[in-house]
């Protein structure tokens, strides 16, 4: 017999949550990506969202290896299984991949980072706050809104501070861009953390941090071009490595490269290329949305 919410092809995991009383209704699909599908759900009088993670077979395994470097397994048996690549190890790695976002949300929320409020993790489904705009509609992504110069500067300052707070928690988003930031009535909200990176344990941590900051700078620099001449990522990473970065550390956006050990022109060219690529990708997304 069909379930009463089946007209929207509700995933079995959400039907389980309905049967267990965690949620009362699946309202509609919100979005579907490579890693997960997100649904608007109702729990009592509250409207929330439920993130249903896709199975390992539907996602890129090799891509996840780089992000998972440095993450702690929950026990020695699990660590050995992951290392040997056994079936149990792959299941354990899958569980760790899903749990990483849940753990990060709680940790970052407690550290003052503006993320969706988590409401629990049930049967592989993350139930959390549905971020809305001032009118109560689903909040747009940062890459979908037009800003004036003052707003762009304000949002950039807010997001740089969020990245600093994440880094002080030992975490790097790993895939941060204008399309992983929602614009709520109180400002930017950072979303999507399944690929969260260990700042101390991942050899690519610095590269990923700089990419995150450069993506934001390239996007917001469209509205406030002088942001493109700032070096917040390099500055905060240097302070982090020196053990001097605090959640409220005042940053200048200026950074002096050591020309004795660094190819300064090469570094600047690489960063500018990354920012240009981020801008090109954003423009491509906007054109695709316009065509749709």
Where do the protein language model's features map onto the residues?
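Amphipathic alpha-helical transducer elements in NTP-driven molecular machines
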Residues: 95-102, 156, 206, 210-213
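Short, surface-exposed loop/turn motifs that are enriched in glycine and acidic residues
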Residues: 91-94, 145-152
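Conserved ATP-binding subdomain of kinase catalytic cores across diverse folds
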Residues: 3, 7-138, 164, 168
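Regulatory N- and C-terminal appendages and interdomain linkers associated
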Residues: 1-29, 150, 154, 158, ...
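Catalytic activation segment of kinase domains across protein kinase-like and atypical kinase folds
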Residues: 44-55, 61, 132, 138-145, ...
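Catalytic-loop of the protein kinase fold
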Residues: 168-178
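A glycine-rich phosphate-binding loop feature that marks nucleotide/adenosyl-phosphate handling sites
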Residues: 124, 180-183, 233-239
